[in-house]
Amino acid sequence: MKDFDLLNIKCPHCGGQVEYKTYASINSKSDPELKEQLLSGQLFRYECPHCHEKGYLGFPFLYHDPVNHILIQYTSPEKRDETLKTFIGNIAKAKEILGNEFDKYRYRLVDEFGLLCEKISCFDNGLDDRVLEITKILVGYILEQRNQINDEERLYLYDAGDHLRADIINQNVKTMKQIKINKEIYNVAKRDYSQYFDEEKTKFAIINEEWAATLLNKISKKN
């Protein structure tokens, strides 16, 4: 049985009470249906039983992938620093109790839903999220030169077998376009930049485009 909490929230449309389920953690192996609801966005959606208006409400939780040895803490941007401290503390306590079992894990903190889905897909397909973030910067530059992306759009990359799929999303106007990307860009990024990864520091880290841009800037200054 899955552990969840029931919250009573007020419908923003009619003011009626709505019961809303939240989960403290999701295990991709034991809760595959919850994982599917997460990736589809259904996990955060609700329908008011009174006016039948539908809404969306996120909540923090821990995503646990025991197969690929991944722990991802999802939180809001406003609580990122606070959550990071708590996350680090909880992992340290778990290591004291369970010992070497957690040594093989990678730990990530994510404060944006699109990035969470991208990371789950990344690890499910055996990719390295550090390489993928660098690849996104390279792909983003190419798309900018072709006028296929602008400053209001976000880029996400997904493994699609023989190529990468670029999802370009504009949250302001709720639009998305998809573009095929040559997978060789990822392979080149892995070949050229993996040597600069600090394996110990990036075992537990916030890996995003900001992290990748900082790393590329350091590399350019060295060279």
Segments (PLM) and residue ranges:
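Long, contiguous alpha-helical scaffold regions
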Residues: 68-210
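Short acidic DE-rich linear segments
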Residues: 3-4, 211-223
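N-terminal cysteine/histidine-rich coordination modules
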Residues: 1-78
